[in-house]
From Swiss-Prot:
Homodimer. GO terms for molecular function: diaminopimelate epimerase activity. Keywords: Amino-acid biosynthesis, Cytoplasm, Isomerase, Lysine biosynthesis. InterPro entries: DAP_epimerase_AS, DAP_epimerase_DapF. Pathway: Amino-acid biosynthesis; L-lysine biosynthesis via DAP pathway; DL-2,6-diaminopimelate from LL-2,6-diaminopimelate: step 1/1. Its EC number is 5.1.1.7. Substrate binds at residues 11, 44, 64, 74-75, 157, 190, 208-209, 218-219. Disulfide bonds: none annotated. It catalyses: (2S,6S)-2,6-diaminopimelate = meso-2,6-diaminopimelate. It comes from Escherichia coli O6:H1 (strain CFT073 / ATCC 700928 / UPEC). Gene3D superfamilies: Diaminopimelate Epimerase, Chain A, domain 1 (3.10.310.10). This is Diaminopimelate epimerase. HAMAP family: DAP_epimerase.
Amino acid sequence: MQFSKMHGLGNDFMVVDAVTQNVFFSPDLIRRLADRHLGVGFDQLLVVEPPYDPELDFHYRIFNADGSEVAQCGNGARCFARFVRLKGLTNKRDIRVSTANGRMVLTVTDDDLVRVNMGEPNFEPSAVPFRANKVEKTYIMRAAEQTILCGVVSMGNPHCVIQVDDVDTAAVETLGPVLESHERFPERANIGFMQVVKREHIRLRVYERGAGETQACGSGACAAVAVGIQQGLLAEEVRVELPGGRLDIAWKGPGHPLYMTGPAVHVYDGFIHL
């Protein structure tokens, strides 16, 4: 099986063309491939499949390192767009794809950045899903013998965002896994720790569902900005500083889609016998 290794701000991926190759990934195979000592090593596996709708170009599938399939990965979407152009699967700059729960438009810019229309953030608890009676800007949760104030949103996948004073000292490794599997998140969640530097700039670390802390989480950056705007903390255009680098997020508010712009890097091509 041929594959490519790619990354978006250090969030790394194994990307596989299932348009011209016949491949099948079991959870056990994915876990073995994800092993950084015995396999390829990655945060997520991205699979390019033929479209199910003639109006679309591709179907986009995402698997976490633990073998679970998820519906959204923002950094992966940028790498997906670069991959299909690099491999000659399309020469379009505006690439229309379906995911497990919707559709996306990926735009490759002249400077090789990728702009992703992430759709409109959804704050309805049932959409996340999150156990709550109604939409609130801030929810109170109990975890690890602490009272946590957080925002909750779906970007096509579930996110919980906590504001912290200093992201460098945030309890990502201890609080992240506890909140990820909290009973109020029946499908688990990605946990973002956000430091507001100013209205146009935040620092962010994300403990990803099924992957742990990563160098960058695109949908997590989108979720943090959406929650920050909902809570009146942020402007419509925000620079998000992650451990792996910078993303630019723009959202005009309810009724509008949210846009993420950032890099996607091809590292190498490989071949593995399954």
